[in-house]
Structures are given as structure tokens and as C-alpha cells.
């Protein structure tokens, strides 16, 4: 079991955890990509963070990178299509997102990937979710953030050009914030959570995806 201590003052502990109405702000990007952002969508995110930190069977992984095997700089847990999610609040989030985006996505969100960033040394490198259908089809990835805010960076892929937007976009996400990456975002843009040299508390990222997208 991974034990994570979080200062109560840094978290939203005011209410029982529950997703609110979905009223995201959409930001169009180049090449048919877009992001939706809604701050504080999940109320009571601090209580949910504490439950997930304790209940989820977090795993440390190692992956092959070029000529060596390296530690993945975060803890992981994946819940497939038929798996029960570790907390009913996550089920409520997934179902509400599926209902809201049904007209655009045409299918429900099916899986949930959880990442635990223990401190500023944990990170995820530049990438797109292009394993499976995301490499050729428009799709969506919805991310709910819990715990200490960390920046999520987005930039156009070099292979498709900037489309007039050559700057890196930065979203500081935490405390129940929601970001949804849609359209062509996974194959025409990249995203990352960089390392931080500052003293940084833990963060949990919950990623909801449709079938066949990783």
C-alpha cells in the first residue's frame, strides 16, 4: 500500500465528493483539435483523493526506453471496460461525462487510467494517446485532477506543423479540475506533465477514455 500524506488546507474538503453540472469552456486548437476546461468540476476532491490514495492498488512499472529499462516516474493503475472502479464517485464522473459528450463522441467512456504523482520528481513525457484508435481517429480523453495542482502542457506535433500556433499551452490542474482533449488532439498535439524542482505535494490524475484508446 502506498501512503501519501496531503495537507488538508491544500485540498477541497468542503463537501462530499460529487461531480457538478458540466459547463466547460472550449478552446479550439489547430488541425481540428480542441480542449474543454472546467475548474472545480468535482466538489470534495480532497476526500476522494484520500480514499483513492489508500484504496487503489498502485503499481510501480518499468519500461524499455531505447537501449535500457527505466522506472516509470509515477505510480499507475488501469481499470478496463469490465472492471469496477475503485470509488462510486469515479463511476458518477464517467457516466456524467459520457452523457454530456454522447452527441460528439458517439459512444461512452469505457476505461479509467489512474496516475499518482508523488511529488515534483514524478512526471510524464511528451506524448499523445495514440495506441489503438487514437492514432487514426478523432477521439476524446477526459482528465479529472485531484490534489496538488500540476501543469499540463500541450504543443502541436512537429510532424503536422504549428497551424499558426507554435506556442506551448499550459494549464495548471488540481482541486477537482477537468480537462477534455478532443477532436484530433491525440494525433496532432502532444501533452506532458513536467518535473518540478519546487516542493510539490501529490496529485492523482484520472483519465477516462472510450474503447480502444490508450
Language-model segment annotations:
Residues 1-214:
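Non-heme Fe(II) oxygenase metal-center motifs and adjacent flexible, charged/small-residue loops
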Amino acid at each position: 500500500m502506498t501512503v501519501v500524506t496531503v495537507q488538508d488546507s491544500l485540498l477541497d474538503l468542503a463537501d462530499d465528493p460529487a461531480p457538478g453540472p458540466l459547463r466547460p469552456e472550449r478552446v479550439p486548437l489547430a488541425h481540428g483539435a480542441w480542449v474543454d476546461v472546467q475548474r472545480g468540476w468535482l466538489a470534495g476532491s480532497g476526500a476522494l483523493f484520500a480514499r483513492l490514495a489508500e484504496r487503489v492498488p498502485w503499481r510501480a512499472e518499468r519500461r524499455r526506453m531505447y537501449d535500457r529499462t527505466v522506472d516509470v516516474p509515477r505510480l499507475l493503475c488501469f481499470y478496463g471496460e469490465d472492471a469496477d472502479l475503485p470509488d462510486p464517485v469515479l463511476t458518477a464522473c464517467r457516466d456524467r461525462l459520457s452523457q454530456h459528450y454522447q452527441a460528439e463522441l458517439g459512444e461512452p467512456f469505457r476505461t479509467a487510467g489512474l496516475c499518482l504523482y508523488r511529488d515534483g520528481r514524478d512526471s510524464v513525457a511528451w506524448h499523445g494517446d495514440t495506441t489503438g484508435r487514437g492514432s487514426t481517429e478523432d477521439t476524446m480523453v477526459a482528465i479529472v485532477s485531484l490534489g496538488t495542482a500540476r501543469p499540463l502542457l500541450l504543443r502541436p506535433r512537429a510532424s503536422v506543423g504549428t497551424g499558426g500556433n507554435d506556442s506551448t499551452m499550459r494549464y495548471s490542474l488540481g482541486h477537482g479540475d477537468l480537462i477534455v482533449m478532443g477532436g484530433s488532439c491525440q494525433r496532432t498535439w502532444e501533452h506532458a506533465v513536467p518535473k518540478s524542482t519546487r516542493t510539490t505535494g501529490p496529485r492523482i490524475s484520472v483519465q477516462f477514455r472510450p474503447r480502444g484508446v490508450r
